A protein has these predicted regions:
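Short, Lys/Arg-rich, polar N-terminal cytosolic tail immediately upstream
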Residues: 1-10
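A structural signal for multi-pass alpha-helical bundles of membrane permease subunits
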Residues: 14-284
Length: 284
């Protein structure tokens, strides 16, 4: 066999091996989600059988009825939508403005402020819990959405991310041309810069929406009333009595309902997310 033929065979073999590995990785990734959806259609007794059921059952409506009977699920669902959407919108606004300022303008102590901002990224997030809890308590924000939204309205990583993207993708000549035409600074940002930032904004939106939707520990500290709780706290209430056992079918139903919006948002914005991450990695 000639060298080119051997190289072609070796290339096809490597490609087949890569495809097999990717297939196995995909199965390992999605199988837990598949089991979650399947178990949402079974009772707890059926789930605990050996081997567990791998096909859909007939108790999905029964489990759903128990979920909405035990907790105000849809009210808590709306709470999560409001909190996560507010955090994401404010993060996009403030981080894009901060990144734009660091990328375009010159002002005193610019490097010092940016270095300080990056330094805060090295601190564990647990360090902020006690100061924020004290602030929220003194402002009488306990059991309100403000206690969740305000501390998360801006992130150091978001400012850094937008600053890097703007520095690499927004030409200063374009901004100068807009100023020559008499465009105010605010309109330059919203009409000239923001359309260029669409991939970066989409990526940042997903990176902030998912953690805010899944946040558990901090909301557990500042929310104690069921009517203002977010979905992760409600799922915790559905665990039931650990000594008498929990209803796994009900818990899996609520978990599936809670994860569905997150999966839909990610799938709809996946292309934007990938393009934003790729642009930031290549040009940043």
């Amino acid at each position: 066999m000639k060298a080119p033929a051997r190289a072609a065979v070796g290339s096809r073999g490597i490609r087949a091996l890569v495809l097999v590995m990717l297939g196995l990785l995909a199965i390992l990734t999605f199988f837990p989600f598949y089991m979650m959806v399947i178990q949402a259609t079974h009772t707890s007794e059926e789930i605990l059988t050996t081997p567990p059921p791998l096909g859909p059952g007939v108790h999905s409506l029964h489990n759903y009825a128990k979920v909405v009977a035990v907790v105000p699920f849809w009210r808590n669902f709306l709470n999560s939508v409001i909190v996560s959407s507010s955090i994401t919108a404010l993060t996009l606004l403030f981080c894009s403005l901060g990144g734009y300022a660091f990328a375009v303008y010159q002002f005193p102590l610019k490097r010092v402020l940016f270095a300080t901002l990056l330094g805060t990224m090295m601190l564990p997030w647990l360090v902020d819990l006690i100061p924020w809890f004290i602030i929220v308590t003194r402002l009488h924000w306990l059991n309100s959405f403000l206690a969740l939204v305000v501390p998360s309205a801006v992130s150091a990583f978001g400012v850094f991310w937008m600053r890097q993207y703007i520095s690499s993708n927004v030409p200063l000549e374009l901004l100068d041309a807009a100023r020559i035409d008499g465009c105010p600074e605010g309109l330059i940002f919203f009409r000239v810069v923001v359309p260029i930032l669409t991939p970066a904004l989409a990526a940042l939106a997903i990176m902030n929406f998912l953690p805010s939707w899944n946040s558990f520990f901090y909301p557990l500290l500042v929310l104690t009333k069921a009517k203002v709780m977010t979905l992760p706290l409600v799922l915790n209430l559905l665990h039931g009595d650990p000594y008498r056992g929990m209803d796994y079918g009900v818990l899996m139903t609520a978990t599936t309902m809670a994860l569905a919006p997150v999966m839909i948002v990610f799938w709809l914005a996946a292309r934007r997310f990938i393009s934003g991450m790729t642009a930031g990695a290549i040009k940043g």
